[in-house]
């Protein structure tokens, strides 16, 4: 399993949000996890994390998904300009998964890491197993 950059939003004494970018979705970028502490929500942390992931992604396409029940994530993605890309039933019983695609024009801009110095980037890693490096 190959793990991509991790982004942490900082506020006050420590991290208040976390995002994980992986390249396991048809070898394209996929925002697999985005979470913000309840005390830091509605303060732009998630938007800054999504912007950092957009800037960091090294593949031509960047996707993410959210359950139909996850209205806050859907609003965030639509406000950030992401486009609906599909719907999958059966992953979570009774709660279909909506997939979103980051538009290419959002990905071609210069890195926003200088704009958001509170974003911390992790290193890409590989896992060694008895069967070889993944």
State the predicted function of each range.
Residues 28, 71-89:
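Conserved N-terminal glycine/acidic-rich loop preference
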Residues 33-41, 66-68:
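A short, internal acetyl-CoA/4′-phosphopantetheine-binding micro-motif in the GNAT/acyltransferase core
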Residues 36, 42-55, 75, 79:
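Conserved acetyl-CoA-binding loop-helix of GNAT-fold acetyltransferases
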Residues 56-68:
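Conserved GNAT acetyl-CoA-binding A-motif
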Residues 118-120, 124:
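Acidic, Ala/Val/Gly-enriched low-complexity intrinsically disordered segments
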Residues 126-133:
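Short, intrinsically disordered C-terminal tails of secreted or membrane-associated proteins
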